[in-house]
Amino acid sequence: ENLKIWQVLQHDGQEREAFEVACNSLDIPVFFAASSCRNLCVIRSELAVLQKRGKEVTEEELIQIALKQHWYEEEKGTPLKYIGKLVESFGLKVERRFCREINELFRELEQGHDVIACVDGGELSGNLEQEEFEDRWIGEIPYHVVFVRNIDYSVPPGVEVYDVAMDEPVRVYPLDCFIVS
């Protein structure tokens, strides 16, 4: 039921507009991370991995590959099961894990592996009031990905990510905020 509501909000302009009006009347700004970057968060995160690994490729080339392989749709983005397919298509090994243990993420980064994490983009924005509203009416849905670059062990600890939905894509989120997302 929650997924159906989310799909309506993503694809039905009139329903989404009504939702935004309701949110605005409650003074809750609407934040759709995936929509703000044309649903390219997966492609751009995989591009960052490929470029870090020395592969010369453009965003447009990756979009064309993903469209041809049916790994990406402009209106919907990239389904979870296809995250990493672009990286694999360039001969790099991808391991998919579905976990919520932050220690696993720490271990992967310490071993020099690249990590793309599925998150609730709104949780990262730090607007807890909006997120409580969204979680109640839409559900807790990880609809955005970030390329995790580093763990900052200072006090308080943080997670440095490349987040294409932000004006300044390289940013450090507080560790507790990242875990919740």
Residue ranges and their predicted role:
Residues 2-4, 61-181:
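Conserved active-site-adjacent core of cysteine acyl-enzyme catalytic domains
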